[in-house]
């Protein structure tokens, strides 16, 4: 769907928008079917002069490629809704359905179709501007904590969606593990940050849910640096968890 002029001015760069549309028209007329188109997005934080551009230097540029051609994603580098355009028929064929009246479903939107994606194209242009830092924003920590049940629901849906060990392509499997890991880390740290006994119980229940669903996945997530840091025991351990998350935000740009 084409965006209105006002939406384009607020969220996306017109020059990049035109380049992408031209390239999509060109690729649509080609011999090879394209499943996913990727472009850069920009974090623009309210009140800050520095803008963080999410580039994908690990991806081949300006030609169609497959997962086999992808280099390793670094920590903090994810394909988000702001950077991806899926082929519409692929979304229908993979059975994508998003929970209604729920925040944070953009993670399901990006995650669910990935195993169906065989061909990709990356254009190194800064397309979408993602404005962050507003107090009423859904990714604001206080807002996320108030909606934590919706975040947990999305997290569980992603856990249930696939047996990741059966994803045949090793590079895709590794990326999907990393994506599920950061979603689980975010759920966990928000539950810790709330400071309530009720939410600490929800934290334990979330990890038990993962363990009950897939014991190998549970151990894989727990064995990672962030997984370990999120599950340190006691009040002191929780302080270390929050400090580790804050450090990760600064070092690798978690939002």
Stretches with model-predicted labels:
Residues 13-121, 128, 132-144:
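Donor-binding/catalytic cores of nucleotide-activated saccharide
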